[in-house]
Amino acid sequence: MEFDPAKINTSSIDHVTILQYIDEPNDIRLPVCIIRNINNITYFINITKINPDLANQFRAWKKRIAGRDYMTNLSRDTGIQQSKLTETIRNCQKNRNIYGLYIHYNLVINVVIDWITDVIVQSILRGLVNWYIANNTYNPNTPNSTTISELDIIKILDKYEDVYRVSKEKECGICYEVVYSKRLENDRYFGLLDSCNHIFCITCINIWHRTRRETGASDNCPICRTRFRNITMSKFYKLVN
């Protein structure tokens, strides 16, 4: 099932954005609550509202060696203290629509999403998170934001155009399909490894990552076998600064 942004209802309570993905014909109602941190740099997602079992699984995973190592590496890579990678909004009458455990979006996309057994919900969740981030990366009303000149805008557009031109020709190193030509829109994203520059579509590298984890194997690049820690979902073949 292809992700459809037209099926998103957006609302907010206090500092929490609530995305409701509603697909009545397919009996799908997926709520995703998102908090942007005070610097508007990163995002935290409520996994309790997606499924209460996910919060319990996450707490158990965080206590295991793999979880502790992942949290340590994520804290180092993001510069965020481990204690700040999660946030809890308590359950009370005022917060009944937004309470729960919020965790850094990297943990959702690279860890928690693999615990969801329904592949349709997986796909929709990934699409929702990506859609929200893509539409909220720059907010001209953010306090202390820097004014961008017309010349700066032209330079930015030129840079993105160059990266897009290269990206649209790139093939996944696993399925050998051109990433931008894949049938499903949600598959037309790159999965960037933090250890090397090999090219993969997000779907193939996530399947590889999940399979390696299930078999107890190391998280190694399928091509060069260099060990990686994180997978970043990106519309381009490389990160654009």
Swiss-Prot record:
One GO cellular component, as annotated: host cell cytoplasm
Residue stretches spanning the membrane: none
Keyword vocabulary terms for this entry: Host cytoplasm, Host-virus interaction, Metal-binding, Modulation of host cell apoptosis by virus, Modulation of host ubiquitin pathway by viral E3 ligase, Modulation of host ubiquitin pathway by virus, Transferase, Ubl conjugation pathway, Zinc, Zinc-finger
Zinc-finger ranges (RING-type): 172-225
Every KilA-N domain range: 21-131
EC annotation from Swiss-Prot or TrEMBL: 2.3.2.27
UniProt KW Zinc keyword: yes
Class of this enzyme: transferase
Keyword Transmembrane helix: no
GO biological process, one term: symbiont-mediated perturbation of host ubiquitin-like protein modification
Molecular function terms from GO: acid-amino acid ligase activity; ubiquitin protein ligase activity; zinc ion binding
Record's subcellular location: Host cytoplasm
InterPro entries referenced in this protein's UniProt entry, alphabetically: E3_ubiquitin-prot_ligase_p28 (IPR016398), KilA/APSES_HTH (IPR018004), KilA_N (IPR017880), MKRN-like (IPR045072), Znf_RING (IPR001841), Znf_RING/FYVE/PHD (IPR013083), Znf_RING_CS (IPR017907)
Family of the protein in this entry: Belongs to the orthopoxvirus OPG021 family.
Domains (record comment): The RING-type zinc finger domain is required for E3 ligase activity.
Annotated function: RING-finger E3 ubiquitin ligase which catalyzes the formation of both 'Lys-48'- and 'Lys-63'-linked polyubiquitin chains. Plays an important role in virulence by acting as an anti-apoptotic factor.
Annotated PANTHER family: IP09428P-RELATED, MAKORIN-RELATED
Protein's name according to its UniProt entry: Host range factor p28
Organism: Ectromelia virus (strain Moscow)
Highest classification ranks of the organism: Viruses, Varidnaviria, Bamfordvirae, Nucleocytoviricota, Pokkesviricetes
